[in-house]
């Protein structure tokens, strides 16, 4: 690494300073330091991936592993979000995500990693957070553990390893897709309360599903019966109420149309898939994509703008929002092609993952229906 930790720390402060937007020299110097700092993690990340592949094989030979260097946009957001955060101490510049079949395999891998020196401090302690045992307020579930791996010049670099199940991963993928199109920042505890409640309740139901025998043994028919029986049981009225709230939220029609939240989300996922293909084919440069989705016909119109054309894209977006405000048949969104690439990088199988997410939402809807009417019948009988 060409720069000292003091210079890296200063670059972190400068990244979120007011002066950086008006001082070209400061911007250039800061971005140069940031790029070098990020790049110094690349070979350490490769070493971490090699190390993990051997361990993962012992826990789940069908596990999915993805690595990434934290994007500049995400680094800036994190620095702004946490007052005491510094660039030099940010522990997830390099990150690896391991997606395993179920919680049993997640715990098996976690226990294996806990014994490895690369995850232990000099005094033998672990630096980790278990959001599966204690989920975040929004319902996020995963295990984060910090390891130290050497880069190509022998420097130790922090690498964050995230362990989660496929269902936990599908939940996170779907939240990212909603954030991308609605600009709510649910991930940062911002946005509409009804969406926060939806994802929190879904996380609760997913936790129940993951602990059922049918899920652990991948027996779909057994799982469906087990889950419906669980939800409709007389002692689980609160669980049934949560399932009903999820059912009502995703099936309610959007104002002025017969189009549901579920259908809108699926169109978002399909739109993202279409945009991503255009970007990957090199037909769209870095910049912005303006979408107009007709919720009655399912037709999607897209316009691509280069990065320098943001003002034009923003003005058109505002115009469409204003002119279509009274017409509930249209949904308008302005998304960054860079953000689309970010989802692909963090969630390479996002399209398939979103389908898995909604397949389990369908199960929750089915259980809500059966549970509600079973409960009604019980109340009448008593």
Describe these PLM feature segments.
Residues 326-373:
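Short, mixed-charge low-complexity intrinsically disordered segments
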Residues 113, 119-151:
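Short Gly/Thr-rich strand-loop-strand
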Residues 309-325:
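A short, charged, amphipathic alpha-helix used as a generic interaction element across diverse proteins
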Residues 101-105:
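Helix N-cap motif at beta-to-alpha junctions
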Residues 80-90, 321-324:
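Short, flexible, solvent-exposed loop/turn segments with mixed acidic/basic and small polar residues
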Residues 29-81, 299-303:
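Surface-exposed, low-hydrophobicity interaction/linker segments
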Residues 300-308, 332-335:
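A short, exposed loop/beta-hairpin motif centered on an aromatic-Gly-Thr core
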Residues 1-34, 38-41, 155-288:
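An acidic, glycine-/histidine-flanked metal-binding catalytic module
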